[in-house]
UniProtKB/Swiss-Prot annotation:
The keyword Ion transport does not apply. It holds the Pfam family Trypsin_2. It catalyses: Acts on substrates that are at least partially unfolded. The cleavage site P1 residue is normally between a pair of hydrophobic residues, such as Val-|-Val. Its EC number is 3.4.21.107. Coiled coil: none annotated. Belongs to the peptidase S1C family. PANTHER family: PERIPLASMIC SERINE ENDOPROTEASE DEGP-LIKE-RELATED, SERINE PROTEASE FAMILY S1C HTRA-RELATED. It is found in: Periplasm. Substrate binds at G218, N219, S220, L275, G276, V277, V278, I279. One of its GO terms (cellular component) is periplasmic space. This is Probable periplasmic serine endoprotease DegP-like. The keyword Transferase does not apply.
């Protein structure tokens, strides 16, 4: 090999080596450094332990099994977990249950945020600080609907977290959690924001932040930080089929939590807006049946009598597209928006009614302490009118008592389901039909007349009440 060619190869090798070093340095710079954030934020993160007295259901001394024949390892296990204790004269011994969670200090005088499920039904709450000192905590108040609890400990000049704005959080942004998974204090995990505005079952009023941050038992109630060291959420739940972390974690937005904590601090309870409707998601078939361009909005399946919606003129079958200018993309968006308003607030709804857009002004009510009782549907007495169409159902008029119980002006109850579309979509005897093809049903006779003229090969909606709960379903009639 000639000297010039060797020099050329050496120059190329050096260039490649330098390029690799540059790329490596850039990659290192691209990865976030959490050390400063953790050092500054950790002192305000606390471990929360609770104690609760429960009736003792352990096996009594006279009922203990014979452990002598067991191997030493198993014998020690049972002796440790099933200690022989004498019964009290009344036999009403108590045992103590303990739980573990996390929290964070939001004020230097000792207010602490955590999850409601961490401290629910606790007889004693202990907050352990980062210096391992322990303080008794007083429960200021809880809000089970958002799973937020506010505690108070006696203290001065306590370290506090910085509060951020969860509305400014972006999908793909780095986030970090500090907590006590399985009791390991101040464990740090990191990840990114996977989605915003998630709705989980039984958590209608929380637009959850979804992340892939590793969250495990004991992390509940701990803070979720952004890269500025600000708390943007409270780690609350995970989705799992194994009992452990599977990459899906959910945090309560700090904006929601602070609003709740302010109300708990001031009033000891939380009040939120209420519309008084039962809503459901608008899928592709429902969108077609209601004349919508695409699936969007919240379909009103039921309007509660004397509720704010009923007084404002909202009707069953209306599709709510926006509230105060904020679009309702999914039905779950509506409770989030309504819940942030106070009783007496005015709101403007954009709705679709009978295929036409219109605006409706409503006055928001106060959320009842308990869920409203909307009645329970029962079977009907009397003769059934045979449906002479391809739905395959026999129906009869509702009795006056049933109409009153279900708060309906009309409708029919299914007496029998034959082979056909009704059976295919899961209708059952006892189901109540109040609307068919966007028309209110007054009687069995009207139901039969409407059914005869149903369009073919097009989605048709039907409003059905089962055990008092209303929902719209769709079906298609073939040629």
């Amino acid at each position: 090999m000639s000297i010039p060619r060797l020099k050329s190869y050496l120059s190329m090798f050096a260039a490649v080596l330098m390029l690799g070093q540059v790329l490596s340095a850039q990659a290192e710079e691209a990865l976030p450094d959490f050390t400063t954030l953790v050092e500054q934020a950790s002192p305000a993160v606390v471990n929360i332990s609770t104690k609760q007295k429960l009736p003792d259901r352990r096996i009594a001394a006279g009922q203990m099994p014979d452990l002598e024949g067991l191997p030493p390892m198993f014998r020690e296990f049972f002796e440790r977990n099933m200690p022989q204790q004498p019964r009290s004269p009344r036999g009403d011994r108590q045992r103590e249950a303990q739980s573990l969670g996390s929290g964070f200090i939001i004020s230097s005088d000792g207010y602490v945020l955590t999850n409601n499920h961490v401290v629910a039904d606790a007889d004693e709450i202990i907050v352990r600080l980062s210096d391992r000192s322990e303080l008794q905590a007083k429960l200021v108040g809880t809000d089970p609907r958002t799973d937020v609890a506010l505690l108070k400990v006696d203290g001065k000049n306590l370290p506090t977290v910085k509060l951020g704005d969860s509305e400014k959080l972006k999908v793909g942004e780095w986030v970090l959690a500090i907590g006590s998974p399985f009791g390991f204090d101040h464990s740090v995990t990191k990840g990114i924001v996977s989605a915003k505005g998630r709705t989980l079952p039984n958590d209608t009023y929380v637009p959850f932040i979804q992340t892939d941050v590793a969250i495990n038992p004991g992390n509940s109630g701990g803070p979720l930080f952004n890269m500025n060291g600000e708390v943007v959420g409270i780690n609350s739940q995970i989705f799992t089929r194994s009992g452990g972390f599977m990459g899906l974690s959910f945090a309560i937005p700090i904006d929601v939590a602070i609003d709740v904590s302010n109300q708990l601090k001031k009033d000891g309870k939380v009040s939120r807006g209420w519309l008084g409707v039962v809503i459901q998601e608008v899928n592709k078939d429902l969108a077609e049946s209601f004349g919508l361009d695409k699936p969007a909005g919240a379909l009103v399946a039921q309007v509660l009598e004397d509720g704010p919606a009923a007084k404002s003129g909202l009707q069953v079958g209306d599709v709510i597209l926006s509230m105060n200018g904020q679009p309702i993309v999914m039905s779950a968006d509506l409770p989030h928006l309504v819940g942030t308003l106070k009783a007496g607030a005015k709101a403007k709804l954009e709705i679709i009614r009978n295929g036409k857009r219109q605006n409706l002004d409503v006055t928001i009510g106060a959320m009842p302490d308990d869920d409203a009782d909307i009645g329970t549907g029962t079977g009907a007495d009397g003769s059934a009118e045979r449906s002479s169409n391809r739905l395959g159902v026999s129906v009869s008029d509702l009795t006056a008592e049933q109409k009153k119980s279900l708060e309906l002006k009309g409708g029919v109850v299914i007496k029998e389901v034959q082979d056909g579309p009704a059976a295919m979509i899961g209708l059952r005897p006892g189901d109540v039909i109040s609307h068919l093809n966007n028309q209110a049903i007054a009687s069995a006779k009207q139901f039969t007349e409407i059914a005869k003229d149903l369009p073919k090969n097009r989605s048709v909606s039907m409003r059905v009440l089962r055990q008092g709960r209303a929902s719209f379903i769709t079906f298609k009639l073939a040629e």
